């Protein structure tokens, strides 16, 4: 364990449940790496993701973005391909891109968008894109004919959230350089989206635990009952 991490750990009481402002403030103060660390939110939910009716998945545009330059690949043809290029997509194509991904194991992009008519083609590389979280999905707004809107939202700071096998959602909410106030705005937007996405089949306490941490720093726990205060 590094010296900086040990020093940072002393600032955070591991047994405490902070309010969101306190936790984010501590996370910013304990991010001591020599680069602009990403601040991440980790929420354990009271769901059983093995059941189809307890999946939590969606997307939300963070008001202050993520601080990350996002590279967007779009599968589209004709007018929709032109629309994607004009909207600022980094890569646009169809079967040619499928072949490139298959033959070169090519992943120089962060988000994949596809028009619905292209999903048959994209499906050929589902086994490759799926495990990397890159498969376009209607729930996250990445399967759409409105490619210009999808690209604009992604570039503006749209993040996808999805509960993993251990019932936890991991999501970036910005960079250390944002400061506490902007991080709090992003945190609140994402938490509100998670609360709205609560499955009807989920019983008992929904927000089990909430932690924020920087890339290299320790985590600060937030009181789940006061997450949106």
From Swiss-Prot:
Pfam families: Ribosomal_L1
Keyword annotations: Repressor, Ribonucleoprotein, Ribosomal protein, RNA-binding, rRNA-binding, Translation regulation, tRNA-binding
GO terms of biological process kind: regulation of translation; translation
InterPro entries: Ribosom_uL1_bac-type, Ribosomal_uL1, Ribosomal_uL1-like, Ribosomal_uL1/biogenesis, Ribosomal_uL1_3-a/b-sand, Ribosomal_uL1_CS
Any one Gene Ontology molecular-function term assigned to this protein's record: rRNA binding
SUPFAM superfamilies reported for this sequence: Ribosomal protein L1 (SSF56808)
Gene3D superfamilies according to UniProt: 3.30.190.20, 3.40.50.790
GO cellular component: large ribosomal subunit
Subunit structure: Part of the 50S ribosomal subunit.
Entry-linked HAMAP family: Ribosomal_uL1_B
Function recorded in the entry: Binds directly to 23S rRNA. The L1 stalk is quite mobile in the ribosome, and is involved in E site tRNA release.
NCBIfam families with a match to the protein in the record: rplA_bact
Similarity remark: Belongs to the universal ribosomal protein uL1 family.
Protein name (database record): Large ribosomal subunit protein uL1
Source organism (scientific name): Clostridium botulinum (strain Eklund 17B / Type B)
Taxonomic path: Bacteria, Bacillati, Bacillota, Clostridia, Eubacteriales
Gene designation: rplA
């Amino acid at each position: 364990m590094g010296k900086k991490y040990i020093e940072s750990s002393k600032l955070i009481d591991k047994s405490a449940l902070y309010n969101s402002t306190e936790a984010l403030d501590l996370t910013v103060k304990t991010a001591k790496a020599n680069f602009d660390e990403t601040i991440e939110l980790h929420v354990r939910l009271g769901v059983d993701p093995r059941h189809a009716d307890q999946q939590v998945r969606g997307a939300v545009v963070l008001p202050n973005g993520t601080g990350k330059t996002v590279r967007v690949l779009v599968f589209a043809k004709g007018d929709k391909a032109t629309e994607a290029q004009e909207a600022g997509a980094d890569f646009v194509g169809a079967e040619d891109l499928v072949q490139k991904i298959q033959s070169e194991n090519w992943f120089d992009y962060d988000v994949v968008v596809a028009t619905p008519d292209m999903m048959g083609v994209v499906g050929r590389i589902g086994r490759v894109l799926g495990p990397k979280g890159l498969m376009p999905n209607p729930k996250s707004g990445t399967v759409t004919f409105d490619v210009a809107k999808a690209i604009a939202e992604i570039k503006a700071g749209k993040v996808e959230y999805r509960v993993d096998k251990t019932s936890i959602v991991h999501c970036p909410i910005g960079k250390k350089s944002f400061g506490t106030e902007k991080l709090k705005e992003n945190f609140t937007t994402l938490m509100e989206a998670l609360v709205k996405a609560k499955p009807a089949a989920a019983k008992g306490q929904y927000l089990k635990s909430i932690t924020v941490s920087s890339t290299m720093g320790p985590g600060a726990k937030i009181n789940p009952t006061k997450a949106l205060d």
